[in-house]
């Protein structure tokens, strides 16, 4: 039972990463196209590079947080930066405030618009419902966040696979055509890597909401296992979305 609980925590934190990373721009393909597909056939490998970059960073941060028992981002930054903390901890505060203004706004707007489309209720009412749901989940702490993240992740993954996989199988010829066109256009690898780097770096700000989950790990090395699983999940789902976009990328309509 203890071993089962340990691995459920490891998987739960991995799902927290996925649900934090996942959003309207991810599901619709807007972000994937902007940062990956538009740079040619390299889009088949650059999502993996970005996620490995994130996984290494997050694994170290969670390992550090668990080892030094610093579970809020201010304490974590103070321990990490040492004598430079007065500068970099305060800079991170500014960054975190900016991210927290933008990211929830996107979540509320996307969730509210989707719920409004599905239910026919006014957009503002749906946005309020999304906000109340997020608030309730947040106030009950990290255990509930992990449970909700696990349930949402499974629903999201199943939903994406149901939508994308049949389309990918049915349009395999279009994917081959798109890949051939991309290959012949000879998009530079450097630009593709730089775009993946930008995407991955933007995601690093999420560490502020991750370090609190390090408290649940039995030992620091569990962070490496958790982020390894999260990396695989994110790579698979990003690749699925990339292939889904490639089915229509060569069709101007």
PLM region spans:
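Juxtamembrane transmembrane-helix boundary signature
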Residues: 17, 48-74
């Amino acid at each position: 039972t203890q071993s089962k609980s340990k691995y459920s925590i490891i998987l739960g934190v991995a799902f927290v990463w996925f649900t934090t990373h996942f959003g309207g721009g991810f599901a619709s393909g807007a972000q994937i196209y902007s940062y990956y597909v538009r740079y040619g056939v390299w889009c088949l490998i650059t999502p993996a590079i970005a996620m490995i970059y994130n996984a290494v960073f997050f694994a170290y941060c969670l390992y550090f947080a668990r080892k030094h028992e610093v579970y809020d981002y201010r304490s974590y930054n103070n321990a990490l930066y040492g004598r430079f903390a007065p500068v970099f901890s305060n800079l991170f505060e500014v960054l975190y405030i900016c991210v927290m203004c933008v990211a929830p706004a996107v979540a509320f707007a996307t969730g509210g618009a989707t719920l409004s489309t599905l239910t026919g209720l006014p957009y503002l009412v749906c946005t309020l419902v999304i906000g109340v749901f997020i608030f309730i989940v947040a106030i009950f702490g990290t255990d509930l966040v992990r449970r909700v993240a696990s349930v949402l992740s499974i629903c999201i993954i199943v939903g994406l696979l149901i939508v994308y996989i049949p389309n990918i199988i049915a349009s395999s010829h279009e994917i081959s055509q798109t890949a051939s066109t991309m290959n012949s256009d000879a998009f530079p690898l450097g630009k593709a890597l730089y775009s993946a780097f930008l995407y991955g770096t933007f995601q690093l700000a999420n560490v502020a909401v991750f370090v609190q989950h390090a408290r649940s790990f039995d030992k620091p090395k569990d962070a490496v296992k958790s982020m390894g699983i999260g990396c695989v999940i994110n790579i698979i789902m990003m690749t699925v979305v990339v292939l889904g976009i490639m089915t229509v990328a060569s069709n101007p309509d």
